[in-house]
Amino acid sequence: MTVIASELSAAIRSIPDYPKPGIIFRDITTLLGNPRAFRRAVDELVQPYAGTKIDKIAGMEARGFILGGAVAHQLSAGFVPIRKKGKLPHTTVRVAYSLEYGVDEMEMHVDAVQPGEKVILVDDLIATGGTAEGAVKLLRQMGAEIVSACFVIDLPDLGGRKKLEDLGVDVRTLVEFSGH
């Protein structure tokens, strides 16, 4: 583990048996509340793209809004919120995506991304990859070029990274936690 990964993982609270027995919930609110760790995480998410023309950062509800907004600011890019169905006020495009126990839908405004725009997808964590896969499909449906998908936390045992890589998406993460 790198020094940066060690610093960031120390700022993330682990809550056993939440939301159900056998699951360890990785809570980034402690990282967000620590100014040094929050800045370090944003700087590390931004660093690979410094000097690269990125048009939009797409953040997934809800923690992806916090991280994605900060990354968009640093890269002088626009921000696109990807939300659960029914939460956006203007005309939207929608896609169904798989959850661990079923299917849900996410959407974004129809005019949020233009064909050919370079987009980075940002969220706090990738687990099974179902939500991120849905966001990738939604962005591609609108003609976006997905430069990368970036996450603070990867739970590699759950296969989300591979799911996105199989779609041809570059995946970048800052910290890995084994198990669930």
Curated annotation (Swiss-Prot):
<keyword id="KW-0660">Purine salvage</keyword>
<comment type="similarity">
    <text>Belongs to the purine/pyrimidine phosphoribosyltransferase family.</text>
</comment>
<dbReference type="InterPro" id="IPR029057">
    <property type="entry name" value="PRTase-like"/>
</dbReference>
<comment type="pathway">
    <text>Purine metabolism; AMP biosynthesis via salvage pathway; AMP from adenine: step 1/1.</text>
</comment>
<dbReference type="InterPro" id="IPR050054">
    <property type="entry name" value="UPRTase/APRTase"/>
</dbReference>
<protein>
    <recommendedName>
        <fullName>Adenine phosphoribosyltransferase</fullName>
        <ecNumber>2.4.2.7</ecNumber>
    </recommendedName>
</protein>
<dbReference type="InterPro" id="IPR005764">
    <property type="entry name" value="Ade_phspho_trans"/>
</dbReference>
<dbReference type="GO" id="GO:0005737">
    <property type="term" value="C:cytoplasm"/>
</dbReference>
<dbReference type="Pfam" id="PF00156">
    <property type="entry name" value="Pribosyltran"/>
</dbReference>
<dbReference type="GO" id="GO:0003999">
    <property type="term" value="F:adenine phosphoribosyltransferase activity"/>
</dbReference>
<dbReference type="GO" id="GO:0002055">
    <property type="term" value="F:adenine binding"/>
</dbReference>
<dbReference type="GO" id="GO:0006168">
    <property type="term" value="P:adenine salvage"/>
</dbReference>
<comment type="subunit">
    <text>Homodimer.</text>
</comment>
<dbReference type="GO" id="GO:0016208">
    <property type="term" value="F:AMP binding"/>
</dbReference>
<dbReference type="GO" id="GO:0044209">
    <property type="term" value="P:AMP salvage"/>
</dbReference>
<dbReference type="InterPro" id="IPR000836">
    <property type="entry name" value="PRibTrfase_dom"/>
</dbReference>
<keyword id="KW-0808">Transferase</keyword>
<comment type="function">
    <text>Catalyzes a salvage reaction resulting in the formation of AMP, that is energically less costly than de novo synthesis.</text>
</comment>
<dbReference type="GO" id="GO:0006166">
    <property type="term" value="P:purine ribonucleoside salvage"/>
</dbReference>
<keyword id="KW-0963">Cytoplasm</keyword>
<keyword id="KW-0328">Glycosyltransferase</keyword>
